[in-house]
């Protein structure tokens, strides 16, 4: 993966690199390869992730239909 450094702005180049790596899923893959995961553990983890995704989609669907209140937006202070 290659990132251009413009005007010696290394911080910006690092941000761009991190964003690209996040989008490509490299961080998740690195974490997964740190140690061996048994196939049974992998199945359990993937099933739990699928359940979480399904619940999240159902919650969003109910919010769109007006059955649940919309989530409150966090107030950011600087």
Swiss-Prot record:
Name the family the entry cites.
Belongs to the bacterial ribosomal protein bS21 family.
Q: Where is this region: Disordered?
A: 54-78
Its gene is rpsU2
Its protein name is Small ribosomal subunit protein bS21B
* InterPro entries named in the record: Ribosomal_bS21, Ribosomal_bS21_sf
- What Gene Ontology cellular component terms go with this record? ribonucleoprotein complex; ribosome
What species was this sequence derived from?
Agrobacterium fabrum (strain C58 / ATCC 33970) (Agrobacterium tumefaciens (strain C58))
Q: Name one GO biological process term.
A: translation
- This protein's UniProt keywords: Ribonucleoprotein, Ribosomal protein
UniProt-recorded Gene Ontology molecular function terms: structural constituent of ribosome
